[in-house]
Amino acid sequence: MALPTFSMRQLIEAGCHFGHNTRRWNPKMAPYLYGQRDNVHIIDLQQTVPMLYRAMQAVRDVTAGGGRVLFVGTKRQAQDVVAEHARRCGQYYVNHRWLGGMLTNWKTISHSIKRLRDLEERFGGGDLLGLTKKEQLNLGREKDKLDMALGGIKEMGGLPDMLFIIDTVKESLAVNEANKLGLPVVAVIDSNSDPRGITYPIPGNDDAIRAIQTYCELISGAAIDGIQAQLGAAGVDVGAAEIVPAETLAAEAPAAEQQPTA
């Protein structure tokens, strides 16, 4: 069991060093910028490498302690990648519009998740007798809408222990809610980002698909390493184990062997 490895060359090949046009920058990002080329800011990957590794260690510590990590990326080029890698490591995701209060008003969100489950049971069990085609169509649309918004967190069972965010400008609501609740945030910060409020910043390109894929693979791998450590501590055969949601592991592991969340 070990954290995934990566190199600066890998980050360069993924285009992680390209920031935005120099006119679209946040001066608070100046410490993380190497310079500019053709009116585009170049991010200092010599800082990114250790900061990315530190973020991976933090994610690993959370999942090793049975904690939950919420992946957030609603921009078009991040949606599929975020969902894929959150599922890969048995974690959770929001890859469509962030609903205001998704964290700070969890009670209301929980009611919406219950409604989604009820609708899924009705459709799955064929419990639609007595409904007109129009009523069935309307319920189907409601289910699809709820699933798009909440499908990635319907198994989360409570607030996450950490957020991993792609594009803090677009996901400013998520950052603000996490800060309000004191939840640690791992996030990719581009040249137009505000690094304030980010517990574990990762300076890098948050627009290129290859860059997003690289971050998500590494963070997902770190989460898996933590889960494997927890399974090993609980005496589970890691080689035969299947990655399952974190709260399931926490429920099954002996209480004395669960490690505190970082």
UniProtKB/Swiss-Prot annotation:
<dbReference type="InterPro" id="IPR001865">
    <property type="entry name" value="Ribosomal_uS2"/>
</dbReference>
<dbReference type="InterPro" id="IPR005706">
    <property type="entry name" value="Ribosomal_uS2_bac/mit/plastid"/>
</dbReference>
<comment type="similarity">
    <text>Belongs to the universal ribosomal protein uS2 family.</text>
</comment>
<dbReference type="InterPro" id="IPR018130">
    <property type="entry name" value="Ribosomal_uS2_CS"/>
</dbReference>
<dbReference type="GO" id="GO:0022627">
    <property type="term" value="C:cytosolic small ribosomal subunit"/>
</dbReference>
<dbReference type="InterPro" id="IPR023591">
    <property type="entry name" value="Ribosomal_uS2_flav_dom_sf"/>
</dbReference>
<protein>
    <recommendedName>
        <fullName>Small ribosomal subunit protein uS2</fullName>
    </recommendedName>
</protein>
<dbReference type="Pfam" id="PF00318">
    <property type="entry name" value="Ribosomal_S2"/>
</dbReference>
<keyword id="KW-0689">Ribosomal protein</keyword>
<dbReference type="GO" id="GO:0006412">
    <property type="term" value="P:translation"/>
</dbReference>
<keyword id="KW-0687">Ribonucleoprotein</keyword>
<dbReference type="GO" id="GO:0003735">
    <property type="term" value="F:structural constituent of ribosome"/>
</dbReference>
